Amino acid sequence: MACGNKENEPIDKLTTKFAGLRHDPILDQQIQPLLNQYFAVMAHLQEQDSVNLQLYGTNMIFIADSLIQQDVSLDTATNHLAIQGLMNIQNEMTAILMESNPDARIMGAQMLSLQWIEFLAAIGYQKQTIYIFRDKEENCWMGLKNKGTNPYENKMDLQYQPIQILQELQ
């Protein structure tokens, strides 16, 4: 999956489709602690001391592992999509934590964000509005507000506008 691009497709849109029919409010509730860890990881991505990144990343891995071990949805297809998405998120976070190079961690965080967007869209997540951002280098990330800073840069004074809302991906 990539932040988009077939040749004639606008590059300011993602190719992921939101599967609203898959929405399961219980699943939304179950993944909320995991989603909170994603936002914590992204908030600590630029810190020189990686202790917080390690803490939140490890928590994300443990929570994902716990969810993978259970049926997270009564719908078999949604359950399968959720488990696959959780495994992808877990694998991306594991790769980030194994990496000591800050640039490689940033690249891993970009992949983590893409996996999250794909996962949330696939399960029809609706508990909160998820805003999707992209910078001019086509790095994607998510936020809960309609303005946000770029977690991949140290410029915390530069505000970005979302390119899309997860629940409106078509």
Label each residue range with its predicted role.
Residues 9-19:
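Juxtamembrane and targeting peptides
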Residues 17, 21-47, 51-170:
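Mature extracytoplasmic or organellar-lumen-exposed domains after removal of signal/transit peptides
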Residues 8-9, 27:
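Aromatic-residue hotspot detector
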